[in-house]
Amino acid sequence: MASKASGGSTRNGRDSNSKRLGVKAFGGQFVKAGSIIIRQRGTKVHPGKNVGLGSDYTIFALKDGIVKFEEKGKKNFVSIEPVEASA
C-alpha cells in the first residue's frame, strides 16, 4: 500500500512563447519598401497611404519613405511619406 496519497495534478504550469508584437518602425523613421512597421492582433492601427496590410494584420511599407502616425476620429492610421531620390 502507498504510504502517501498521490499529489493532485496542477491546472496551471504552462506558458506560451512571446509573439514579439508591437511597433517595429516609429514615426519619423525612414523605411524601405517591404519593411514591417507594426505587428499586431487585429487592426489596432489601420493602414494609410503607401502601406499594406498582411493576412495576420501586419502593416508593412509599400514604398521607401518616412513613417507617419495619425489619428482620424477614434482610429489610428499609419502611412508612408515617400522620399524623392536626390539624384
From Swiss-Prot:
Gene3D superfamilies: 2.40.50.100
GO annotations of cellular component type: cytosolic large ribosomal subunit
Region spans: Disordered: 1-21
Disulfide bonds: none
Biased composition (Polar residues): 1-11
Any single Pfam family the record assigns to this protein: Ribosomal_L27
PROSITE patterns listed in its UniProt record: RIBOSOMAL_L27
Superkingdom: Bacteria
InterPro entries, sorted: Ribosomal_bL27, Ribosomal_bL27_CS
Gene Ontology biological-process entries: translation
Keyword Ribosomal protein: yes
Molecular function per GO: structural constituent of ribosome
Keywords annotated in UniProt: Ribonucleoprotein, Ribosomal protein
Keyword Secreted: no
Family: Belongs to the bacterial ribosomal protein bL27 family.
NCBIfam families: L27
Name the UniProt record assigns to this protein: Large ribosomal subunit protein bL27
